[in-house]
């Protein structure tokens, strides 16, 4: 069983119980954990973030204290689940932060629901295929932007 210093809340959405932690007040930050993890991934940052933001850290379906049904476990399915959770909580827009597999879900959420995405932050993200990785490496290489400015 997951132990958390924060009060775990539950909502039943489409017949499945979803666990999440909600702390703080202000603009909403949605924290998405990696595969095989849960909301406790974010314990070290929830306290400091909740001083300025409303932090929502769910246990993705199939993880932690959330139900583990036969369901759609694709990144699109998880993105839809986050949209549904936020809708039930009355939240319109979020800064979505994803770690590892949660980064893939965060990117999919931002792609599917740009009107609900304030910012996207990736932490050691999964979901970046080989076709994306060289581009990210290139644009983060020192000197890339000045060289591109000279070429364009």
Briefly describe each language-model feature range.
Residues 16-65:
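Conserved HGGG/HGGXW glycine-rich cap/lid loop of the alpha/beta-hydrolase fold
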Residues 43, 83, 107-111:
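Short, hydrophobic alpha-helix immediately C-terminal to the catalytic nucleophile
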């Amino acid at each position: 069983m997951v132990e958390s210093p924060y009060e775990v809340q539950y909502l039943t959405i489409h017949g499945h119980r979803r666990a999440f932690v909600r702390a703080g007040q202000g603009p909403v930050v949605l924290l998405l954990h990696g595969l095989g993890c849960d909301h406790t991934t974010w314990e070290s940052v929830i306290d400091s973030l909740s001083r300025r933001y409303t932090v929502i850290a769910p246990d993705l379906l199939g993880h932690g204290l959330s139900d583990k049904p036969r369901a759609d476990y694709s990144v699109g399915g998880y993105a839809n689940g986050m949209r549904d959770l936020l809708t039930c909580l009355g939240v319109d827009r979020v800064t979505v932060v994803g770690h590892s597999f949660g980064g893939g879900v965060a990117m999919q959420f931002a792609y599917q629901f740009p009107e609900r995405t304030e910012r996207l932050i990736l932490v050691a993200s999964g979901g970046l295929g080989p076709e994306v990785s060289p581009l990210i490496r290139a644009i983060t290489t020192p000197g890339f932007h000045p060289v591109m400015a000279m070429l364009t």
